Amino acid sequence: MLKRLMLASAILPVVSFAESDPLDVLLKKLEEKGVITKEEAKEVKKVAKKHPHLKVKIRLQPRIDFGDIYKENNDYKSRSDFYFRRVRLEISKEWKNIPFGKKLKINFTLHSDKGERDYDYKKGEKEHHSFDPKVKYAYADWTFVDEFAVRIGKNKIPYSRVSLTSSSRQLLIERPYVTEDAKKWLGDYDSNQIMFHGKVAGGIFRYMLSIWDGSTIESKNKTGGTVKADTSLGDAYAIRLEFSPPGFVEKKKDDTGIGEKNKGDVISVGLNYAKNSDFDITDKNIKNEEATVWGGDIFGRFHLGPGALVAQAEYVKMKYDKLDLEEKGYYIQAGYLIPTPYGKFEPAARYEHFKQEDKKNDVTKHKKDIITLGFNHYIKGHKIKWGYNVLFIDNKEKDEKDQTVHQIQMQFYF
């Protein structure tokens, strides 16, 4: 018995951060060499399963941007930029069969996204980002029943499908312009919040309702002014509703043809509305301003022929009420996953359009049409893959030149 406990204590720190297969291999080797018996190996496995270990994952996305990414004297200059779009350390733990409820999960994620990036191609500006680790997510999610769960802590605000989908499972390298602006419209998209969520009828209906204080709008917004925010819980809220027809339920958001957690075809329709109220834009003499974001989306994955077709569309509209600043846009994207002897290959394309208008002064501040073409090459699913995109950006603002931007990105997720 003492030998089993010593083996368990020695092995657990190693296998606690891995899947169960490495433990099976190790025990088999020890058994073959006569270090432990078959019964002792079974006992060690039992102890290991009971041991409360953490799940640790690392995500790296090295990336190169080149082309028209820097603007000088109102003209774009060709530059190149090598950086890490994502550097993340994800630590999580899940308890099942808890005394009250179905399961409890905690998540703590550190990130240093855009580390060593020098150029922001959307602005055409040189803007250096250093490797500066920060907390990305920190929350506890308690599922009482499938129909009702509570999540408390720092996490994504529930609006926009493409934004809620992990960047590790995106069809194209960058998310659309309009949805990226929507993430800054109400404040920080990753905010401390209380979220109520659940799924009904086996996931045919799904809902998310969040409340938070909205204070992050002081540091992140699209008003173009200086914002002072009220910090009362409930001044900001968001609701998202999702529906899938019976037989087409989506278990986990994945915008690609891989769909690791989804067996069979998938259809998902989503609607969301979010609001942040009672903040002031001090340098514009605006008090009790309100910001809203609403939109809808549809996604489908269908197995056709040897591969899988994915198609997705989303519409987003945002407004600052008294400032009378409005932005709206949409995108349509699709891809087809093709199995090959050298991994899976997925050509993809997207068209997007967005426009930001100052209604009060009848001025169009930003207007763009963007066509993105590219492909993904999956060497080992989402764990090891790489992709290439080329963006043709039609800048319709006065005196703005068009851009052609190339992007190459790899992903290592382990």
Swiss-Prot record:
Domain of life, per lineage: Bacteria
Keywords recorded for this protein, A-Z: Signal
InterPro entries recorded: Porin_dom_sf, Porin_O/P
Pfam families named among the record's database cross-references: Porin_O_P
Signal peptide range in chain numbering: 1-18
Record has Signal as a keyword: yes
Entries under Gene3D superfamilies matching the protein: Porin
Protein name, UniProt field: Uncharacterized protein aq_693
